[in-house]
Amino acid sequence: MTRIRRGYIARRRRTKIRLFASSFRGAHSRLTRTITQQKIRALVSAHRDRDKQKINFRRLWITRINAAIRERGVCYSYSRLINGLYKRQLLLNRKILAQIAISNRNCLYMISNEIIKEVGWKESTG
């Protein structure tokens, strides 16, 4: 009976996984079982952190807008600005507002002053 040589399918699958894990440290880039486990963990972490990144950037934008707005006066806040934008139907998202707050603060003050005039919030001291 002649010897049958193994096919290349399993080897091709393992090399594909090894290429994915080539930057991992230690046995996580050398042993097939640990490579597959680490690949699953890496993909789970990447999926989770993509959502987390969106949350973190939104939080950063809100913090930047709020800091820029509160410099003008104590009574005015981020929530009032966003409420005023919705009432006037201005389509400025938080990312754009944060960029305006950093690069061109006077423009943000002009927007907020227009909203204050239209909505009619009074400056409260105390």
Swiss-Prot record:
Cellular-component GO terms for this entry: chloroplast; ribonucleoprotein complex; ribosome
Keyword entries, A-Z: Chloroplast, Plastid, Ribonucleoprotein, Ribosomal protein, RNA-binding, rRNA-binding
Subcellular location as annotated: Plastid, Chloroplast
Source organism superkingdom: Eukaryota
Record-linked Gene3D superfamilies: 6.10.160.10, Ribosomal protein L20
Pfam families (alphabetical): Ribosomal_L20 (PF00453)
PROSITE patterns: RIBOSOMAL_L20
Main function: Binds directly to 23S ribosomal RNA and is necessary for the in vitro assembly process of the 50S ribosomal subunit. It is not involved in the protein synthesizing functions of that subunit.
NCBIfam families listed in its UniProt record: rplT_bact (TIGR01032)
Family designation: Belongs to the bacterial ribosomal protein bL20 family.
HAMAP family given in the database record: Ribosomal_bL20
Record's protein name: Large ribosomal subunit protein bL20c
Source species: Lactuca sativa (Garden lettuce)
Gene: rpl20
